[in-house]
Amino acid sequence: MKFKSQKIAFNFFAFSMLLLFLQIVYGYIMGFARIGMDGLHEWIPFNVARATHTNLLVVWLLSGFMGAAYYIIPEEGDREIEWPWLAQIQFWSLGVVAVSAVIGFHFFYWEGRKFLEIPRELDYLVVINVLCFIANIGVTL
């Protein structure tokens, strides 16, 4: 790595791999439930597994994209990320969103709309997160 700020990307990549693993686990849970082997149905109903599975996909893709940008942009711009502290805050807030959403799904705290299940408060945090990302990358370029 040429720049110290590229180490921020590792957090995003590691988080993406964890979420991908969890998404695969929830996919297996749904697959087994589909063929009638739903021993976990009392603890993880199918609708909760589907909501979690779908939202994990969105978050790990978002995290992976942000990590890739934080790795590539310093090399392309030949300079450090302008606000590495903002990238760290952004990483932790994305983690809070992901964990809160998954826990919320298991306690039936969601909006109930198809593919837009996370609560409105977390939607706002995701928007703020993406705006911080755009600002950080824009200032760096």
Residue ranges of model-derived segments:
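Inter-helical loop and helix-membrane interface segments of multi-pass membrane transporters/permeases
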Residues: Y109-P119
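Hydrophobic cores of alpha-helical transmembrane segments in multi-pass integral membrane proteins
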Residues: F10-I35, F46-G77, P84-F108, E121-T140
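Solvent-exposed, non-transmembrane regions of integral membrane proteins
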Residues: L40-I44
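Short secondary-structure boundary micro-motifs
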Residues: F3, G31-R34, L116
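Cytosolic juxtamembrane amphipathic/interface segments immediately preceding
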Residues: M1-I8
